[in-house]
Amino acid sequence: MKLDRIRSFFNTATYWPSIDSQIGEYVKYLKGRVLNAGAGDRDISHLVEGELYNQDIPTGIHNKNIHIYSPLHEIPVEDDFFDAIVCNAVLEHVEDPLRVMREFYRVMKKGGYLYLAVPFLQPEHLDPTDFQRFTKDGLQRIVETNHFEVVTIEGFLNVYHTVSWIMQEWLTSKQSVFYRALRYLIFPILRYQCKHSNAYVHRISSAYRVLARKA
């Protein structure tokens, strides 16, 4: 077990904060009926003060934690149903994000809150598809175009998350002694910076997030 931890230490470049850390101060908006859009295996039940609905697309494998199986642009609930929506690292995987945003607006109650996080500087990651990335202006545009009011929008996850992801993909594909030594040298440094550095997060963000309100 100890040997496995040592191997992981020298062979893992990336560090991703927990969903608790990512949502952070915005947890206070997760009250009432809350939709976890594109939930997958991500558990936010401990963050919700109210009733949680986990939604995801059908995959052929039953997940007892999913309450709603549907496309994200066709959620089978009535209008004005949810008090809050969490959509974390999902919108890049949908073919038509504007259509999804219109559906979010439909199913949310007036005065409800949307927490939406999207990637900017991140490699392609299929789940099962991967269509787009979002700049800060692009994120604001799709939110406001669909009649949400932006409360706050900001970069989060630092540039080291981007660099470490790329280095992880590249260097772990190489098996020579040289590249293995490079992994042992670089990966612990990158992982530390991912975890502890906020340098340039407002200028070179790996991702963006927005808190928006249905006025």
Q: How would you name each of these model-derived features?
A:
Residues 1-28:
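Class I SAM-dependent methyltransferase Rossmann-like catalytic core
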Residues 10-14, 92, 200:
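Short, surface-exposed alpha-helical recognition segments that flank or form part
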Residues 7, 11, 88, 127:
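Conserved short-loop catalytic and cofactor-binding motifs
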Residues 11-18, 31-32, 36, 46-50, ...:
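A broad, low-specificity signal for short, low-complexity segments enriched in glycine/proline
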Residues 98-99, 103, 113-215:
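S-adenosyl-L-methionine-dependent methyltransferase catalytic module, highlighting the catalytic core
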Residues 15-20, 36-38, 66-67, 191-194:
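Short gly/ser/thr-rich secondary-structure transition/capping motifs
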